[in-house]
Amino acid sequence: MKVLHVCSELYPLLKTGGLADVMGALPFAQNEIGIDARLVLPAYPAISRGIPNTVVVAEFNNFAGHVVLRYGEYNGIGVYLIDAPHLYAREGNPYHDMWYNDYTDNYKRFALLAWVGAELATGLDFWWRAEIVHAHDWHAGLTAAYLHHKGRPAKSVFTIHNLAYQGRFLPYHLTEIGLPWWMFNVDGLELYGEMSYLKAGLYYSDISTAVSPTYAKEITTPEFAYGLQGLLQTLKAQGRLVGILNGVDEKIWHPYSDPYIEDHYKLKSMQGKRKNKIKLQAYFNLPQNPNALLFVMVTRLTEQKGVDLLIGSAERIVQQGGQLAILGSGSAHLEAGINWLAQEYPENIAVKIGYDEALSHLMIAGGDVILVPSRFEPCGLTQLYGLKYGTLPLVRSTGGLADTVIDSSSENIKARHATGFVFNDADVGGLCYGIDSAFTLWRKPSQWESVIVNAMEQDFSWQTSAKGYQSLYDILLHK
């Protein structure tokens, strides 16, 4: 079974969010179970540096200008690089400039990515032809449209990592990307008068997947669908929308072998976790008190992630003698809000603006509770890392958070099902309820330890996810 993943990021070479983590793990897990999985990405500078040894597979001119398709390997996985310097030779973020302005030629940059993805199912590489073309998020959404235009030479899968980002462009660009005008239609690319690359992926793919079962249900409702509820409800009714949970890359995220921390630990030997907590407190200049309940948050600072809810409820942590460490960057007003908290409560709250991979590992290893109070969360990875490290997730009941964390109610604790703390309402009161629940359990050490055991025994490996996709591919190939 030959599967091509069409994507725009690959951990650890280039990452702006969770998509990169998925692409840095799923194809590798698929290879381990016998799927011949490859990737195709733009040859961004960071990607090219990480995969320096390549051979030319094809060279051509199309709507995007002169393009060279290269092939190399990364950790044993075949990777095609689309070498078009006039489109991709830009350092930093792949989607916008240093002032956060989207590149004006994004419509063409990501149309080319999708076009090449489709062509690799029709013989662009003479030696390898995809049977399944699996596109990820709006950047690759046009792949299924090009496949449709070519007579569907391969089966197509489209994965929604975040429906909020829709890849919308003015319709006159359609003439510049090699697709016919008749595809700009409500039954096609059109979304409220614009082209939507994400809608193209949904409409033209044989099947679409969301990155958790609950998110697959949520996006059929107006609250989560961003205007696409009609199409998504139709796909669900047709059996063309399913949810498959993301996994944890245990080569990178495992407390017993984590390359970023010095003090490793495992379920039956937890001394390392206590050492990581002291190191984390020292890093953030917080009192090195092992008895203080330490909350951590590693996130983009946006309303989606519930950062404003945390700003409104952080005093609840302070009042009960807890500590809070935050790592992230994002909206200026939210950065200002958490910086104010750190200045107001220097003994309890500390912040680092930016992103630091090594620090994120120390925070998840050293924290007691990891906060994920998102308004919506397609899957979420940090709560899965928290479970793996015995850092109990405090989450809102939405998307993948609802699928992966079981609340520490008295019934769930008694039944040995509890793995964290769950609240329902996306408001300050809801998060305060979750914070209070964490403190209540913290004061019962034996119960706290039993919940940690449950959490660390959960299996959210990529092998499980890979088998889920394999079953999906099998169904498509035998239709």
Swiss-Prot record:
Identify the metabolic or biological route this protein is part of: Glycan biosynthesis; glycogen biosynthesis
| Biological process, per Gene Ontology | glycogen biosynthetic process
Q: Which UniProt keywords apply?
A: Glycogen biosynthesis, Glycosyltransferase, Transferase
Q: Which InterPro entries match?
A: Glyco_trans_1, GS/SS, Starch_synth_cat_dom
Query: Where on this chain does ADP-alpha-D-glucose bind?
Result: K15
Task: Give the UniProt family note.
Answer: Belongs to the glycosyltransferase 1 family. Bacterial/plant glycogen synthase subfamily.
According to its UniProt entry, the function of this protein is described as: Synthesizes alpha-1,4-glucan chains using ADP-glucose.
The protein here is known as Glycogen synthase
Organism of derivation:
Histophilus somni (strain 129Pt)
Q: Tell me the classification of the organism that encodes this protein.
A: Bacteria, Pseudomonadati, Pseudomonadota, Gammaproteobacteria, Pasteurellales
